[in-house]
Curated annotation (Swiss-Prot):
Pathway: Isoprenoid biosynthesis; isopentenyl diphosphate biosynthesis via DXP pathway; isopentenyl diphosphate from 1-deoxy-D-xylulose 5-phosphate: step 1/6. 1-deoxy-D-xylulose 5-phosphate binds at K125, S151, E152, S186, H209, S222, N227, K228, E231. Its EC number is 1.1.1.267. Belongs to the DXR family. InterPro entries: DXP_reductoisomerase, DXP_reductoisomerase_C, DXP_reductoisomerase_N, DXPR_C, DXPR_C_sf, NAD(P)-bd_dom_sf. Catalyzes the NADPH-dependent rearrangement and reduction of 1-deoxy-D-xylulose-5-phosphate (DXP) to 2-C-methyl-D-erythritol 4-phosphate (MEP). It comes from Yersinia pestis. One of its GO terms (molecular function) is NADPH binding. This is 1-deoxy-D-xylulose 5-phosphate reductoisomerase. Keywords: Isoprene biosynthesis, Manganese, Metal-binding, NADP, Oxidoreductase.
Length: 398
């Protein structure tokens, strides 16, 4: 039985992970749960899965959780803060760590799991977007095992030779017969919306994804296709791919989750019903296969599968992310930070949908930054970019 720590247990990925545990209780045991401030949901999770430990992001939330659990007779030990999250990610008797805390906030605990040599189920793409080489160097040094959770990266992983799977981030695609990775994306809810209407898009409209059920931040990223841009950056690091070895294709049906093209002309693709429980179950049980609880794909109901080239006028954030990736780690760190701030401002109705790209581009182009050589330097770039993004937002509101 695999012992599991879930970082970000009350989020979308965390809940899907617990759904897989629920479907396979003989295979997985939850040892620790880590979340932000959603006390009531964390209490429900603790009562159902009886973890030994739980941690909240702040002491006030932790105190509230202790009171709720004490009323129910739970003996789960409750802690708070980033240090606690890192300690629970590195517990000696934990086999797997689901790294699903959204944003740069998830970096310290994800790195703690890596440094402890755990099998890390990586849903926190920001770890690679901001720390790329530094992160992969830690993986190599600690001999941790990375298993990608994003549906696209998991699809690519499944379609690659086992030799690459076992040496993720360091094997040569070319030497293993791979010519190109094809990263697919639906295009989000505004794929056919007239560009003239983009400035009037509301947060609720942006969060109404046609195929996937996701959190609000990632839903907005999907609408701008920044999510695909961030996935592009992540894929470059995860699969040791050059710019010439990866392309992005729009696939509105979200049935083919990504593809790998080989030298002999073959293309391997992973297909399935769009449900995050599928890649989560694959990574949790790897190299075995277990029930995910997802309904099987019905090809007759799906009908046609279509593909188009992304339009950068419609999706300028995608182009911005690809350009940042080619510029280096400082640019991708700044972009990620600016995007977190701008999306938050949009969700709070402080800026327009079209302002997201403007803010992101202004931050990336306006900061003159050296390439980071440590995680501490990455965090400095992150803070600077957030400050500049906040200043740009303030100017837009004046």
């Amino acid at each position: 039985m695999k012992q599991l720590t879930i970082l970000g247990s009350t989020g979308s990925i965390g809940n899907s992970t617990l759904s897989v545990v629920r479907a396979n209780p003989e295979l997985f045991k939850v040892t620790a749960l880590v979340a932000g401030r959603n006390v009531r949901e964390m209490a429900q999770q603790c009562l159902e899965f009886s973890p030994r430990y739980a941690a909240m992001s702040d002491e006030h939330s932790a105190k509230s959780l202790r009171l709720l659990l004490a009323e129910q007779g739970s003996d789960t030990e409750v802690y708070s803060g980033e240090t606690a999250a890192c300690e629970l990610a590195a517990l000696d008797d934990v086999d797997q760590v689901m790294a699903a805390i959204v944003g740069i906030a998830g970096l310290p605990s994800t790195l703690a799991a890596i440094r402890a040599g755990k099998q890390v189920l990586l849903a926190n793409k920001e770890s690679l977007i901001t720390c790329g080489k530094l992160f992969m160097d830690e993986v190599k040094r600690s001999r941790a095992q990375l298993l990608p959770i994003d549906s696209e990266h998991n699809a690519i992983f499944q379609s690659l030779p086992e030799r690459i799977q076992r040496q993720l981030g360091y094997s040569s695609l070319n030497e293993n017969g791979v010519s190109r990775i094809i990263l697919t994306g639906s295009g989000g809810p505004f794929r056919e919306t007239p560009l003239s209407q983009f400035s009037d898009v509301t947060p609720d409209q942006a969060c109404a994804h046609p195929n996937w059920s996701m959190g609000r931040k990632i839903s907005v990223d999907s609408a701008t296709m920044m999510n695909k841009g961030l996935e592009y950056i992540e894929a470059r690091w995860l699969f040791n791919a050059s710019a010439e070895q990866i392309e992005v294709v729009l696939h509105p049906q979200s049935v083919i989750h990504s593809m790998v093209r080989y030298h002999d002309g073959s293309i391997l693709a992973q297909m399935g019903t769009p449900d995050m429980r599928t890649p989560i179950a694959h990574a949790m049980a790897y190299p075995m296969r277990v029930s995910s609880g997802v309904a099987p794909l019905d090809f007759c109901k799906v009908g046609a599968l279509t593909f188009t080239t992304p339009d950068y006028q419609r999706y300028p954030c995608l182009k911005l992310a690809i350009d940042a990736c080619n510029a280096g780690q400082a640019a991708t760190t700044a972009l990620n930070a600016a995007n977190e701030i701008s999306v938050m401002a949009f969700l709070d109705s402080k800026i327009r949908f079209t302002d997201i790209e403007v803010i992101n581009r202004t931050v990336v182009e306006g900061l003159l930054l050296s390439e980071p050589t440590s995680v501490e330097e990455v965090l400095v770039i992150d803070r600077k970019a957030r400050d500049v993004a906040a200043q740009v937002i303030a100017k837009l509101n004046n």
